[in-house]
Amino acid sequence: MLYNLLLPHIHNSHIANLFHYITFRSGLAIIITLSISFVTGPILIKFLRSLQKYGQPIRSDGPESHKTKAGTPTMGGIMIILSSCLSTLLLADLTNKYIWITLFGFISFGIIGFMDDYAKVKRNNHYGVRGKSKFLLQGIISLIIYVLLEYLDKNFSHLLNVPFFKNLSLDLNYFYMVFAIFVIVGSSNAVNLTDGLDGLATVPIAFTAGSFALISYLVGNLIYANYLQLTYIPNTGELTVLCAGLVGSCLGFLWFNAQPAEVFMGDTGSLSLGGVLGIISVITKHEIVLAIIGGLFVIETTSVILQVYYFKATKGKRIFKMAPLHHHFEKHGWAESKVVIRFWIISVIFSLIGLSSLKLR
């Protein structure tokens, strides 16, 4: 909004001219989201405590240390969605189609997560909305997003770019629709599975969002895209502002989510954040790079898939003491803080590997 209001005055005002730069607005987005989080956090937590008698239900088969988390409110993802959306509406170019499509997906996945959190709190168990119903809703939202991209972007490509290789792209043609939906839904649920310890998912999400802030900026800039031999996609640079807002909102949320957590993001936060990262990767044509940068999410999801299939195939045997993987290490005696920090380190490594693909070809 501010960008659109100040745009006519960029040649007459130094301040207005600053808003012409994506980098300035992105930095401002981080400051604004942090400020909103710090101000609204205590108010929201108090409000959620008053509404949730028992807080987020704690799994009875989980690590013993988790019993101390009983009574901690959930749905803290509302704080992340609120601050991110407000900063984007304030600072991004509101004539940009990618901004509106991404915000639509972000909020829609947040609503699905809210429904799941509400069901858990109301029933006082950790089951929530049925898995099939959740997948169906996520699939429908992802399909709508894909149709919007196809309809609003006449040059929307079905090519799948392969990182670390020059000019290597696979034309998925009509299958790209299925692939795009898989990326968005998969990303949403992968982040959701990772969000099992205080602060565990928050920092890797911030790393991933920060990485895609850079990717969006480079892909949307003709000079940089040509230099790095990336697929140039006009107008994607504005997503940098949104990604920067996600970084700030995650850091702001971490202030309250660090161990011992005062609030959990819940599915409201994890499904929406995972979904929005998937959407941005599809728009910027960096779907495989998302799997690299978000490698921690992939590992956590894979551990669950392996555990479930092995359990069924062997009629009761397990590969891990508990899945997702972070619980396995807890069961091995690792302190929660050690698991979280070591997983953060792994996330940094994956982010660096993913970003290196922009240059190493």
UniProtKB/Swiss-Prot annotation:
Record's catalysed reaction(s): UDP-N-acetyl-alpha-D-muramoyl-L-alanyl-gamma-D-glutamyl-meso-2,6-diaminopimeloyl-D-alanyl-D-alanine + di-trans,octa-cis-undecaprenyl phosphate = di-trans,octa-cis-undecaprenyl diphospho-N-acetyl-alpha-D-muramoyl-L-alanyl-D-glutamyl-meso-2,6-diaminopimeloyl-D-alanyl-D-alanine + UMP
Family: Belongs to the glycosyltransferase 4 family. MraY subfamily.
Pfam families linked: Glycos_transf_4 (PF00953), MraY_sig1 (PF10555)
Function: Catalyzes the initial step of the lipid cycle reactions in the biosynthesis of the cell wall peptidoglycan: transfers peptidoglycan precursor phospho-MurNAc-pentapeptide from UDP-MurNAc-pentapeptide onto the lipid carrier undecaprenyl phosphate, yielding undecaprenyl-pyrophosphoryl-MurNAc-pentapeptide, known as lipid I.
Annotated source species: Rickettsia prowazekii (strain Madrid E)
EC number annotated for this UniProt entry: 2.7.8.13
Membrane-topology descriptor: Multi-pass membrane protein
TM spans (from-to): 28-48, 74-94, 99-119, 133-153, 168-188, 203-223, 236-256, 263-283, 288-308, 338-358
Keyword check for Repressor: no
InterPro entries: Glycosyl_transferase_4, PNAcMuramoyl-5peptid_Trfase, PNAcMuramoyl-5peptid_Trfase_CS
Any single biological process term in GO: regulation of cell shape
GO cellular component: plasma membrane
Keyword Cell cycle tagged: yes
Main location: membrane
Annotated keywords: Cell cycle, Cell division, Cell inner membrane, Cell membrane, Cell shape, Cell wall biogenesis/degradation, Magnesium, Membrane, Metal-binding, Peptidoglycan synthesis, Transferase, Transmembrane, Transmembrane helix
Pathway(s) this gene product operates in, as recorded in its UniProt entry: Cell wall biogenesis; peptidoglycan biosynthesis
GO molecular function: metal ion binding; phospho-N-acetylmuramoyl-pentapeptide-transferase activity; UDP-N-acetylmuramoyl-L-alanyl-D-glutamyl-meso-2,6-diaminopimelyl-D-alanyl-D-alanine:undecaprenyl-phosphate transferase activity
Annotated localization: Cell inner membrane
Domain of life: Bacteria
Name of this chain's protein: Phospho-N-acetylmuramoyl-pentapeptide-transferase
Requisite cofactors: Mg(2+)
